Amino acid sequence: IVAGVIEASDKVLSPVRRSLATQSVSVLPFTLPAPDGEVAVTREVAGPDEAALSVPGIVAAQLGALIDLTRAGLNIMGNQPTAFEGHSQGVLGVEIARAWIAGDEALAASVFALARLIGAAAARVTRRARAPHAGDATYMVSVRGVSDALLTRIVDSLPSTSHPLSIALRNDTDTHVVSGAPNDLASLVAAIERVAAADKAAHDAHERGGRPLTPVCEYLPVYVPFHSPMLADALALVDEWAAQCGINAALAHSLAAAVLTTPVDWPAQISAAAESGATWIVDMGPGA
């Protein structure tokens, strides 16, 4: 089934095959089903171009997991979920799941084609940005143990940045991901560490009570600043490519924006699902 969706997406993307070929992703290097003990990806890609494979690769894995779940006995065809929620690029998984449940093969192919366009556009625009690097910094950093308000103040306090910094994902009240250029994120981490050091000094001097600030910052292993204004040009490129391929313009823009430029508020999404009547949540992973 997954291989069929990928093959169908090749046909959808025929009008932009030449553009995708410049990034060597006009045909995905996936072997499905993969031989026992082997991975499905037959060609390694590093740097920003990794997104051109990882975005559709994740969607393929999500669809495969959904199919496995139904074969294991969860009848989502007969007992359709109250709601679907996708974290970050999980919105693509949500849309392809809806298409698969509805038996709409054309829509499933279009959604998978969009995943390929989103990954390719993100990779191309990030590479062209030539953002400065700094040590082990990447394009996204996880920040735990810092409130919404404090993190916003620290981001806004930075004197200057080479590219826009944005709080890309709110995973909890004190767990966030910030997107931006690597050198700017390195400056942000240093600023957070200075604030934490000042807070510790105030506690040690008995000038402040309560729980001390103990932030944990970890660079994510990504080469693209998802959910960032830095990818506004990538969104425009997806719109352009989707129009050439005859993909529904509203669908293309909404899904691409959700992955490329729109911030994620995960607690708000879960609250919305609960308000729709959901009482059980089946976590499809990763790590589930």
Which residue ranges define each predicted feature?
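Acyltransferase/transacylase module recognition
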Residues: I1-P81, P225, P229-A288
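Alpha-helix C-terminal capping segments
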Residues: D68, A72, E95-W100
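Gly/Ala-rich beta-loop-alpha elbow adjacent to hydrolase catalytic centers
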Residues: T82-G90, V94
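Glycine-rich beta-strand-to-loop/alpha-helix junction loops that act as flexible
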Residues: H87-Q89, A181, M284-P286
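Short, hydrophobic alpha-helix immediately C-terminal to the catalytic nucleophile
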Residues: L63, V94-E95
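Alpha/beta catalytic cores of group-transfer enzymes, especially the acyltransferase/condensing modules
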Residues: I96-S254, A258-T261
